[in-house]
Curated annotation (Swiss-Prot):
Protein name (record): Holo-[acyl-carrier-protein] synthase
One example of a Gene Ontology biological process annotation: fatty acid biosynthetic process
This protein's record includes keyword GTP-binding: no
Reaction(s) this enzyme catalyzes, per UniProt: apo-[ACP] + CoA = holo-[ACP] + adenosine 3',5'-bisphosphate + H(+)
Record-listed Mg(2+) binding positions: 8, 60
Amino acid sequence: MIVGIGVDLVSVRRMQQLLERFGNRFTARAFSEVEIRDSLQYKNAHAVARHFAKRFAAKEAYVKAVGLGFGRGIEMRGVSVFNDALGKPRIAVSGDVGHNIELSLSDDGEYAIAFVVLHV
């Protein structure tokens, strides 16, 4: 049974501006160690921004699906987006969430999008 859905769209250009302006202060607040480590595989700033934009969109889509916001029991670093062994995007959440999470990520040009479905 579906218990929540969420979608979010993030500007890759805006993410790149945030990364240029705030650097490690921003990534340390918003992203998990796994997400930061995974970004190191990219060689240029635009690819890094695309990586973080998709993960940021996934976090926002997740909290929308749950029906809460960040700071209301969910912290940004407590939601970690990674790819499994087959390359499928996954979300790991700190604590027992009591539901299954399906995640789809995409990017095209200057935008990244995430769609989350929660089900039991």
